[in-house]
Structures are given as C-alpha cells and as structure tokens.
Design a protein with these regions (language model features):
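Accessory cap/linker subdomain of secreted extracellular hydrolases
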Residues: 2, 6-19, 24, 31, ...
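Catalytic nucleophile-elbow at a beta strand-turn-alpha helix junction centered on a G-D-S/GDSL motif
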Residues: 5-7, 59-62
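Phosphate/oxyanion-binding active-site loops and adjacent basic polyanion-contact surfaces
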Residues: 23-35, 60-66
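Short glycine-enriched nucleophile-adjacent loop
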Residues: 42, 55, 62-79, 89
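Surface-exposed helix-capping loop/turn segments at secondary-structure junctions
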Residues: 44-50, 76-80, 137
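Alpha/beta-hydrolase fold nucleophile elbow
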Residues: 46-60, 85
Length: 137
C-alpha cells in the first residue's frame, strides 16, 4: 500500500516554496502530476506493475481521484507502456459538489440528533451563508 499526499502543499505534503511552479491549479493538473509520480514509481519498482491499482481518497479527494482516474484511462500510451491496470476507485465522504452538499447539512445534523430543533434555524442560516460565499468564490 502506497500513501500519497497530493497535490503539493496540501495536507502534509510540502514542496517548500508555496509559489513554486510545481503548485497545481486544477484537478486535471494534479492528475498529470500524480501520473508522472506513478510513472517514476513503477520505474523504480517494476515488479509492482503486476499488482492491480486502486485509487482511493476522502473529502476533497472527491475532486482529485476522478481526475487521476480519468488521466490514467485517457492516457492509453501510459497504460500500454506500464501495463498497469486501474482496478478500482473509491471515495469516502467525497467533497464532490459543494453547493448541493451544503444544502443538506442542516437536515443531516438535525436527523442525527446533533442539532436540536431550537438551533436548526441558526444552522440553516449559516448553511445558506456558506453556499452564498462558496458561489462567490
């Protein structure tokens, strides 16, 4: 099992210079960076090419995992060269559609008993403000 904290300067990964050219600006670019890493990884450990590749992540990886999987699937040259087979993708608690996901926080918290009816309107107000701010960028 290989754990990769990616993209650079997210989580515990640190490139050093946060203004470096290695900084990514999109999920697709992160997918390209990860494919480049995997290419070098398989050159170092060619025996692992025989193992099925599962890509997993949680939370904001809901943006990056699909991009990485798409990068692999669309790059038929890389697949043919490495002979690596993408066997599966899993995303836990993915942050894939923030505006729509925000819409259900109040209901989720209320139905789980985390927020009482007394505070539900307050949570709904903060939820609405969160959506407004999210859409503003």
């Amino acid at each position: 099992m290989l754990f990769i904290d990616q993209p650079l300067n997210v989580g515990f990964s640190n490139y050093g210079d946060r203004n470096a050219t290695a900084q990514v600006s999109s999920a697709n670019e992160a997918g390209e960076h990860l494919l480049n890493f995997m290419d070098n990884f398989y050159k170092q450990w060619p025996v692992l090419k025989q193992s099925p590749l599962y890509i997993t992540g949680e939370s904001f990886a809901g943006h990056y995992i699909p991009a990485f999987a798409r990068t692999i699937i669309m790059n038929t040259t890389w697949q043919a060269t490495t002979k690596v087979k993408l066997a599966g993708v899993a995303i836990g608690d993915g942050w894939v559609d923030p505006p729509n996901q925000f819409n259900y926080f109040d209901s989720l918290l209320y139905s789980a008993g985390i927020v009482s009816n007394k505070f539900r309107d307050t949570v709904t107000w903060f939820q609405t403000q969160g959506i407004v701010n999210l859409l503003k960028g």
